[in-house]
Structures are given as C-alpha cells and as structure tokens.
C-alpha cells in the first residue's frame, strides 16, 4: 500500500459521508460522537454509539480514518505487516479501517473476515476493503461467541492467522472481556498473530493494565504509542473545524 492509497480512501470516505449534511451538521455529529465515547462511556453497553445517520457518518468519515492512520503506524512499528498471515480476523470491525491498515501493508495481503453487530458498519467495511482492492467478507454478530464457535474453520492453521481488535475490547463488559483474554492468549500461544489496539486514555480502558500484565507474562508485549500527527489535508481541515487539537496519533497496543 502507498500513502496515496490511504489518502485516496480517506478523501473518498469524507466525500461519501458528508454529501448529505451541511458542514455545521456534520461537525455537530463529530462532536456528539466524541462526547458519547469520552463523556458518556457508560452508555456504550446499552446503546450503540452510532445510533443516528449523523453519528454513523461522523464515525465513517472522521474517526475511522484516524483509526486507520493510527493502526497503520502501529502495524509498521511492530512489524506486524511482515508476518506471513493468510487470514485476518477483524473482531468488532466497524467500518473495516483497522484491518485495511494491516492487510494493505502486507506484501501479500491476507483475506479479511470482519465481524460486527451493526449491519451498516459491515456494509461500510465491505466498501472500505474494495477501495484497497482487498479480499474481505463480513459476518454479523457478537465477536466473542464468534471466536468460540463460527470462527473454528479459521483457527485450524493459527500460524497463518492474524487477529485484530481495534478500539473494540473497551466496549465489552467485564466477564466477556475476561473470557476474551483467555481465548486470545490461547490462540497467541498456538501461533496466531494477535494485535489489540485501544485508546491512550485510562478512563476509556481501565482494564488495559491488567490485560497487559497477563499478556506480557505469556510472552507478548505492551506498548504506548504517540505517532507524529500526519493527517492528510481533508481530514486535518475537519479536525480543526471540529475544534480538536491533535499533535499526535496515540494508542496503546498488545501484540504477540
């Protein structure tokens, strides 16, 4: 993947999702979605954060591109793109931005399987992967039971399997998170390449340090990243207009 490919997708996503809104309407939706994630996180387990057309557009055209750029930087910093994976499971895939960042960085891009509960997000994920000429298919449902059941055919060859969870574990309740950690640790021990990406904010992911302790004890690594902010012009203009000050692209990761 070239930088131009990623920028072309970002420009296309912005054009695709802002055309039905005035500038002020779109920016209002961006701010509202940010507030939902930052100030009203307690609602996430009970109510979808993208429960309106405006919020869905804001996620697809603003937050997903930022996730893409951050994930791509983390993938390269960790060398994840050098792993010889043939299948990439994107759990809680949203619009497919995170798996697109990883898969399009690989010399031989893997086939993607994206799992999410939201049908509109899955449709957007399929569109995203097409923009990068990636092979991808979607499954609608909760990714925790998927990993324990329907995913079994993909788990038979763990050494060629990648699993990514980008900004999705923080939306689970405590018991499902605990079950997921056990499952991911087992798959990583069997040879799967597992990448978890979460926000820098400890308030957003207060469980992360406990996960990191367990992950490191099983041979993985935990990192905190602050990458130089290199938003393309179209995304930078939206960020500034929305009133966000952004000097770096940050995330915490678990990798094995």
Give the label of every model feature segment.
Residues 190-199:
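Conserved beta-strand signature within the Rossmann-like core of class I S-adenosyl-L-methionine
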Residues 161-175:
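A short SAM/SAH-binding and catalytic strip from SAM-dependent methyltransferases
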Residues 95-108:
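Conserved SAM-binding loop of SAM-dependent methyltransferases across substrates and taxa
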Residues 126-155:
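S-adenosyl-L-methionine
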